[in-house]
């Protein structure tokens, strides 16, 4: 015997929430793939300075997002199917998966908040090392290529006024061309541009995580209510 009355409304409401959850998983997967192949981050994080690669902390987070998006799509489908079939087993499995996902999201959120400045800090240190080598050593072609990629990708020059002045006088070719020698001095500080690059992307990820967390809370409540309704309807 199928559920009736308010429980039936909850059944279809849960289906709608799961469909939205499935779509959210697809959006997160798409955003993660976009961040993974974004020309700005890709051109910077694929660089190597000698035998030292660029920091990969950002990409570790992206790979986690890709996995989360794929799992969300699977769990959303499981919830939709369980709600339509009125299966306590599927709904129980769905609830368990949601609890695990929610716990992982909270843990990832805490880790992200604690390390939110570390990604940009690592990239800035990598840039500073390359800039120092490029300015001090005329034969450091690898370092020059790294610095030039940063400057052209972010449209910046130097990490502070002194470094920018030194770079302008000694290595003007490292900065984006602008027609005169003062142009690099007027361009934005590279540290600031690196902060803007990663803070904007982390802000986008944070908004997506909050929206998904709210949906998950509603889904856990609705799935338990529907499970109880299915159990009660089978008694009568």
UniProtKB/Swiss-Prot annotation:
Pfam families xrefs: Tetraspanin (PF00335)
GO molecular function terms listed in the Swiss-Prot or TrEMBL record: cholesterol binding; integrin binding; MHC class II protein binding; transferrin receptor binding; virus receptor activity
Example of a GO biological process term: regulation of macrophage migration
Annotated site location: Important for interaction with integrin: 116, 144, 148
Assembly notes: Homodimer. Part of a complex composed of CD19, CR2/CD21, CD81 and IFITM1/CD225 in the membrane of mature B cells. Interacts (via the second extracellular domain) with CD19; this interaction is initiated early during biosynthesis in the ER and enables trafficking of only properly folded CD19. Part of a complex that includes MHC class II/HLA-DR molecules and IFITM1. Interacts with IFITM1. Interacts with IFITM2 and IFITM3. Part of integrin-tetraspanin complex composed of CD9, CD81, beta-1 and beta-2 integrins in the membrane of monocyte/macrophages.
Family per record: Belongs to the tetraspanin (TM4SF) family.
Entry comment, domain topic: Binds cholesterol in a cavity lined by the transmembrane spans.
Protein name: CD81 antigen
Organism: Mus musculus
